[in-house]
C-alpha cells in the first residue's frame, strides 16, 4: 500500500482527492498577522481582499515537520512526499526533517518514506504525484519508483505566465 503526500501548492483534482492514495499538507499564508491555511477552507476572495488592503503584503510559511509526520501515519508502507521547489519554499527541508524525526521515533518500522523536491510548483507537483501513482500501480519496487520519478523530475520544465 502506498500514499502520496503533496504540499498544498500542488493542485489535487477532485478525482485525486477521492483516490485514497493522495493527501495534502497545508502551507499557511499571513496577511498583516492574519493566518490563513491553504486547505479546503481557503477563501480566495477574502485572501485577495486582505492582500489588497495590506500595507506589507502576504507572507507564506511551509508545513511544519509535525504536520508531515502526522501525514506519514496510516497503513501505507511506501510514502512519497512531493514538495514545492526547495528554492521557493522551506517545504522540502521541513519534509526531510520530518522523515528523519519519524525514522528516529519508529526505528522498528518497515515504512519507507522518500521526499521529492519537485523543482516546480502547482501542476508540476501534481504531475509528479501522478507519475508516482503510475509507477506504483505497475508493481515496481519502492527504490525503482524513486529512481524513475527522479529521472522524470529531471526531464521536466515548468513555465509560468504572470498576468
Task: Label each region the model flagged.
Residues 42, 46, 63-67, 90-93, ...:
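Conserved active-site and cofactor/substrate-binding residues in soluble primary-metabolism enzymes
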Residues 69-79:
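Glycine-rich phosphate/diphosphate-binding loops that line cofactor/substrate pockets in enzymes
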Residues 78-86, 114-117, 131:
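Short glycine-rich or small-residue beta-strand-to-loop segments that form or flank ligand, phosphate
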Residues 99-122, 141-142, 146:
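Short, acidic/small-residue loops that bind anionic groups at enzyme active sites
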Residues 108-111, 125-134:
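Acidic/polar active-site rim loop that often engages polyanionic ligands
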Residues 133-163:
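Internal, active-site/partner-interface "lid" segment
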Amino acid at each position: 500500500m502506498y500514499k502520496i503526500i503533496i504540499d498544498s501548492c500542488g493542485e489535487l483534482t477532485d478525482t485525486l482527492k477521492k483516490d485514497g492514495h493522495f493527501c495534502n499538507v497545508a502551507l499557511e499564508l499571513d496577511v498583516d498577522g492574519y493566518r490563513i491555511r491553504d486547505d479546503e477552507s481557503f477563501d480566495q476572495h477574502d485572501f485577495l481582499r486582505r492582500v489588497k488592503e495590506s500595507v506589507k503584503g502576504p507572507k507564506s510559511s511551509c508545513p511544519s515537520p509535525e504536520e508531515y509526520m502526522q501525514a506519514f501515519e496510516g497503513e501505507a508502507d511506501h510514502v512519497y512526499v512531493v514538495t514545492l521547489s526547495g528554492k521557493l519554499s522551506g517545504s522540502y527541508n521541513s519534509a526531510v526533517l520530518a522523515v528523519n524525526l519519524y525514522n528516529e521515533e519508529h526505528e522498528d518500522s518497515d515504512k519507507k518514506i522518500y521526499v521529492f523536491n519537485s523543482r516546480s510548483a502547482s501542476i508540476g507537483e501534481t504531475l509528479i504525484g501522478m507519475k508516482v501513482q503510475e509507477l506504483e500501480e505497475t508493481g515496481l519496487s519502492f527504490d525503482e519508483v524513486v529512481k524513475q520519478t527522479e529521472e522524470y523530475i529531471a526531464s521536466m520544465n515548468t513555465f509560468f505566465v504572470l498576468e
